[in-house]
């Protein structure tokens, strides 16, 4: 049996690579062959699944203090995660963040540095942001736009939110009060006109432009292409070729809900498996009832209890997959 292991991270308990290895151990224990393909959808973990960081640069953090951000440059392609420069974790989470002050300047500094070092193609992951500045600070930090002519910039998004909706949809998750959400929304509405005048680009109607508090829209204004992150990663790792001829595809994530099938890893991998006519198994930390009926789902919490599922996530993944393989 040939199995493709293509999970997302189990947030807080297992990286995508660790989850893929746990799946592979189960397959090998049952005499099969596993292909490990850790996945990401544009959120945290993008750099890791595309080869891992091989550069570290000191940049402006989300609240102004310097941070050291890892990123990758290989064969003229740079991979940058906004979370490593301007992420919510770096701001101290919801409790520590200052939503009106959080800045994407560090992302712009990374992009400038990547191009200065020779990148002609740049992939930028949007997930995990602390910011709702519409990308203005990033654009300012990037310097003269002329240096980006001829550079292909792909913005990997895991949401389809519009630019001016970013504060309302995601602001509370970043610690913004109702009053701050209104202020941030007004900021984004003004930036629509700023970008129209500066770049001749109307970002107000672009799907995905609200990703990372509007950073995606800011980058789109200067010429970047906004794409679904999971599809971009799938193309980079040639998931379609790996799935072809497989007997089973196993994916998973920490929590399964309706959004898992809307631009996230589980839904993306499921689509590739369906297109190839290959059975799919979804292993998750937990799941809501409605989402769980949309695929063959194994919940670690339901099978092993919450305490063990959290404390021994990788062992539980291996055991759950092995049990399901025995049933095939």
Question: How should these model regions be labeled?
Answer:
Residues 1-328:
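N-terminal loops that bind phosphate or other acidic moieties
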């Amino acid at each position: 049996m040939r199995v493709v292991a293509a999970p997302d991270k189990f947030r807080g308990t297992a990286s995508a690579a660790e989850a893929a290895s746990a799946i592979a151990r189960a397959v090998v224990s049952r005499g099969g062959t596993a292909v490990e393909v850790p996945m990401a959808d544009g959120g945290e973990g993008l750099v890791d699944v595309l080869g891992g960081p091989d550069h570290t640069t000191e940049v402006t953090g989300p609240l102004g203090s310097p941070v050291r951000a890892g990123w990758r440059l290989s064969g003229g392609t740079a991979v940058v995660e906004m979370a490593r420069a301007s992420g919510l974790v770096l701001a101290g989470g919801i409790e520590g963040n200052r939503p009106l002050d959080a800045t994407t300047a560090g992302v712009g500094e990374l992009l400038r540095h990547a191009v200065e070092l020779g990148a002609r193609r740049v992939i930028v992951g949007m997930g995990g942001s602390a910011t709702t500045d519409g990308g203005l600070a990033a654009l300012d930090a990037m310097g003269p736009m002329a240096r980006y002519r001829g550079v292909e910039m792909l913005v990997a998004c895991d949401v389809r939110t519009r630019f001016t909706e970013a504060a309302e949809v995601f602001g509370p998750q970043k610690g913004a009060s109702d009053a701050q959400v209104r202020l941030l929304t007004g900021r984004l509405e003004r930036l629509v006109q700023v970008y129209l005048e500066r770049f001749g680009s109307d970002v107000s109607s672009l799907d995905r432009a609200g990703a990372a508090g509007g950073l995606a829209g800011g980058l789109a204004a200067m010429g970047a292409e906004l794409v679904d992150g999971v599809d971009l990663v799938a193309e980079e790792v040639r998931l379609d070729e790996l799935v072809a001829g497989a007997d089973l595809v196993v994916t998973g994530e920490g929590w399964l809900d309706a959004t898992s099938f809307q631009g996230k890893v589980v839904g993306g991998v499921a689509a590739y498996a369906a297109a190839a006519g290959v059975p799919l198994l979804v292993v998750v930390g937990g799941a809501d009832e409605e989402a769980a009926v949309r695929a063959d789902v194994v919940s670690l919490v339901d099978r092993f209890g919450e305490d063990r599922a959290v404390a021994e996530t990788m062992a539980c993944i291996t055991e759950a997959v092995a049990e399901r393989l025995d049933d095939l």
